[in-house]
Amino acid sequence: MVWAPVYWRHYGLQNFLFFCDLGNLFVTAGLWLESPLIFSWQATGLLLFQTLFTIDLVGALASGRHLIGGTEYMFDPHLALWVRLLSLFHVVTPPLLLWAIWRLGHDRQGWKYQTLTAWIVVPINYFWRPEFDVNWARGPFFREQRAVPGLVYLLAYLTLIPALVYFPTHRFLVWLTQRSRAKF
């Protein structure tokens, strides 16, 4: 886990409240414990966003343009290359999660744990060090939104992300595991 002390030094403590960084800690525990719950929990929160990260990174490498956004720091020459390379965990995480769920099975409670995690972590992100906009707690793409009052945005986030990301990802994982089990 070279990643954790390096990130702490370069990015600060608030960085560990990003779902992807929390996910690293949970995935490490999941690997150690071989826990379907931990992998399912993390998959519902990470699969979509880290897949989009990978698409943006590959798109930027291939075309020089960021198709989605979020990987611009990977091309920042002011940040040491070896620190940026540690962020490639975003690319490895989706296949690792899918492999673990294929191997261990999908726990149907995972999306609920991820929702609870969001309900705890995102308000912390909203109120603590708001200038970092961790997990987009104040607005998408690390920009504070101003269309609605901040607390309205926060409540919408805490309702819509579980409904539009976590639950559909859970349903996809249920479908995927049923399909893979039917083949064997």
Where is each model-derived feature located?
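Aromatic-anchored segments of alpha-helical transmembrane domains
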Residues: 1-5, 47-57, 117-129
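Membrane-interface helix caps and helix-loop-helix hairpins in membrane proteins
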Residues: 5-13, 77-84
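Hydrophobic cores of alpha-helical transmembrane segments in multi-pass inner/ER membrane proteins
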Residues: 22-32, 85-100, 154-171
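Membrane-proximal helix-loop-helix units in multi-pass membrane proteins
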Residues: 44, 48, 52-117
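Hydrophobic, lipid-facing residues on alpha-helical transmembrane segments of integral membrane proteins
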Residues: 47, 112-123, 156-168, 172
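Membrane-interface capping segments at transmembrane-helix boundaries
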Residues: 168-184
